[in-house]
Amino acid sequence: MSNHILAILSTPENELSGVVRDFKSFTSKAIVKAIHDENESRREWMLQRLVANATRAARNESYKVWTHDNHPLQMQPHFIMQRVNYIHQNPVRAGWVDEPRDYLCSSARDYQDEPGLLKVERVW
């Protein structure tokens, strides 16, 4: 999705916050670099937004890509399939694609034995 990420992650006990922190740090730098380096028509607008976000934050950052909060849910095995289906249907509900596997950034392709963009460990 263009303004949020839904993911199912598994980490060793008590390490999820560190994984999310490192993910946000790495991707923030990569996103800002891509905005600067690529021929992006909305470059100035996006950088202004990221600078404004950083100005409102208490941390000493030039740009702020991610919000400070997260919304983790601990999932039981019977709930995981429901959440995976919810995640896959998100771009369909938004009207971006007709089928979940048509959304390029979705793991839905992996669940239909088609190659996706990233390596995905299927949960069933």
Task: Outline where the language-model segments fall.
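Short catalytic/metal-binding and nucleic-acid-binding patches
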Residues: 1-124
